[in-house]
């Protein structure tokens, strides 16, 4: 896999030429985003959100099984990396996955790393 500097052309299709042409800026953004997603608790939050349109902080606390302050810290990290979007309604804050590409990535990670039970 060859990595090159910044290019002005659209990203190459690796299936066509076996290469990924990625800028240093894009590599940095991707690395930081994947690092944020890589924490087990944040990954659990993302899995919950991937299965719902949006979820309140209180519901995430109940489903994840940790304190609200801990959940809020992890949500803040994911929001800062623009992985999550939020909205406030009265005294509740709701979170959702902010980009459909993240949902696609979650599906790919599930297919690659998770055991799917056979029925």
What is the predicted function of each stretch?
Residues 2-29, 51, 99-119:
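Amphipathic alpha-helical dimerization/coiled-coil segments
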Residues 47, 72-74, 91:
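Base-recognition residues in the alpha-helical recognition helix of bacterial helix-turn-helix
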Residues 80-89, 96:
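Beta-hairpin "wing" of winged helix-turn-helix
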Residues 62, 73, 80:
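Alpha-helical residues within the helix-turn-helix
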Residues 57, 87, 105-106:
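Short, hydrophobic secondary-structure boundary micro-motifs
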Residues 36, 72, 77:
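Short glycine/proline-centered loop/turn elements that form peptide/ligand docking sites
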Residues 21-67, 93-101:
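N-terminal helix-turn-helix DNA-binding core of bacterial DNA-binding proteins
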């Amino acid at each position: 896999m060859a990595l090159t500097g910044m290019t002005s052309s659209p990203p190459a299709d690796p299936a066509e030429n076996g290469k990924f042409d990625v800028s240093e800026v894009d590599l940095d953004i991707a690395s930081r985003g994947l690092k944020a997603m890589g924490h087990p608790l944040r990954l659990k939050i993302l899995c919950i959100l991937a299965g719902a349109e949006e979820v309140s902080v209180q519901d995430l606390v109940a489903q994840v099984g940790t304190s609200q302050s801990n959940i809020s810290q992890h949500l803040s990290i994911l929001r800062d990396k623009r992985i999550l979007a939020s909205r406030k309604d009265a005294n509740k804050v709701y979170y959702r996955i902010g980009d459909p590409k993240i949902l696609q990535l979650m599906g790919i990670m599930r297919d690659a790393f998770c055991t799917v039970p056979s029925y």
